[in-house]
């Protein structure tokens, strides 16, 4: 049996990278019947939130939710998880660059330590765990296809 999950993610930041910045991440699980369940997470104040940190945090949140769902199931189905993001950075991190960075000791082609290494490594570890029970696919979508997750991020930041 295959258990399918589709998760839409988004991250946002106000005051990107500056002192006093606020950020949030959201993940929206869309069920087969069209209904959805959503979660948000406020970013910590340190390191200062950025849009990129928010987008990777959203990926981590989605991976955590998928693993949590797998642990709740009575059976051990093959998991098929698709994570959607409107961030080309987040999708690139999870599909291409992460493998090169890991091989290069977390340095980029210019020899600089990669930004957001802590979150990217966390996402990589969660991805590895999910790969043990199924497949994870990362898909870029245009912003207008991600309105619910975007709205949830903004609501979270409004409440901070």
Where are these regions (language model features)?
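Short secondary-structure junctions and interdomain/linker hinges
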Residues: 130, 159-160
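RNase H catalytic domain
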Residues: 16, 61-153
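RNase H-like nuclease fold core
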Residues: 1-53, 64-71, 156-159
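Short, conserved alpha-helix that lines the donor NDP-sugar binding/gating region
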Residues: 55, 59
